[in-house]
Amino acid sequence: MLIGSHVSMSGKKMLQGSAEEAHKYGESTFMIYTGAPQNTRRKNIEDLNIEKGQQAMKTYGLSNIVVHAPYIINIANTTKPEVFNLGVDFLQKEIERTQALGAKDIVLHPGAHVGAGVDKGIQKIIEGLNEVLTHDNDVRIALETMAGKGTEVGRSFEEIAQIIDGVTHNDRLSVCFDTCHTHDAGYNVKEDFDGVLEKFDSIIGVDRIKVVHVNDSKNLRGAQKDRHENIGFGHIGFDALNYVVHHDTFKNIPKILETPYVGEDKKNKKPPYKLEIDMLKSQKFDPELKNKILTQ
């Protein structure tokens, strides 16, 4: 099963450290940010320790890794040209880093229209992607399904389809299907996942899905909040998420957990990924999971 989580990439080890962390959690794939998601400070490609990282990946049987673009990129911004231009320039550099790391997809939040309206936001996203996707490489931008918080674009399959349809080189666009976001946007992931997939297929095409973010939700369906919960402890529930993870459609697609660290003490929170992945592999919910994470 191709399953992993978000892991860190930092210090001198960089990609090698990411591979070691993923191996510690029993993963077969993983997702990384090339630096802090909240800023544009990045190391040079030659400082990412790629060769040793890829050797470690081979040793540990890790493949199909995914890069996530930082949150600060907002190519839907119609009011501040400097924000749009920063997003376009930085996204292009992130694509170069993604290619150097050997990843095929970089996940991107489509952006927020900051009050100009969805249609104007979508047109701006299309403009930005058309600038970025003229360069010659084979990295795909995976547009993430969003929860609809604030002025986010991409809360419906139709909005994502509109973006894809408007982009010239849209063979370089894929989709990252996030279970929490889709649930929070109002789709019935919990009780009718096949129905949700059928709708997605009719509007976008399931062959576009190249990454799945596997997250439970702290919120009721349709809340448009985007607050992740540990697997089985939220409003989607273990059975539905287990069904998603083992779905034939996603057999060869990286499934990435972005569930919250566990613990009340902010300085001593524990990563949940090893035990969550073990639980999904066994296909049996463990109500004591959070306590076990704290004592591991």
Swiss-Prot record:
Entry-linked InterPro entries: AP_endonuc_2 (IPR001719), AP_endonuc_F2_Zn_BS (IPR018246), Xyl_isomerase-like_sf (IPR036237), Xyl_isomerase-like_TIM-brl (IPR013022)
Superkingdom, natural source: Bacteria
Record-linked Pfam families: AP_endonuc_2
Keywords: DNA damage, DNA repair, Endonuclease, Hydrolase, Metal-binding, Nuclease, Zinc
Gene Ontology BP terms: base-excision repair
Transmembrane feature ranges: none
Catalysed reactions, as listed in the record: Endonucleolytic cleavage to 5'-phosphooligonucleotide end-products
Residues reported in the UniProt entry to bind Zn(2+) 1: 68, 109, 144
E.C. code: 3.1.21.2
Note on cofactor: Binds 3 Zn(2+) ions.
Binding site for Zn(2+) 3: 181, 226, 228
Binding site for Zn(2+) 2: 144, 178, 213, 258
Molecular function, one GO term: deoxyribonuclease IV (phage-T4-induced) activity
Top-level EC class as recorded in UniProt: hydrolase
Keyword Membrane: no
Xref: SMART domains: AP2Ec (SM00518)
Cofactor(s) for this UniProt protein: Zn(2+)
Family per similarity comment: Belongs to the AP endonuclease 2 family.
PANTHER family with a match to the protein in the record: APURINIC-APYRIMIDINIC ENDONUCLEASE, ENDONUCLEASE IV ENDODEOXYRIBONUCLEASE IV
Function summary: Endonuclease IV plays a role in DNA repair. It cleaves phosphodiester bonds at apurinic or apyrimidinic (AP) sites, generating a 3'-hydroxyl group and a 5'-terminal sugar phosphate.
Annotated protein name in UniProt: Probable endonuclease 4
Source species of the chain: Staphylococcus epidermidis (strain ATCC 35984 / DSM 28319 / BCRC 17069 / CCUG 31568 / BM 3577 / RP62A)
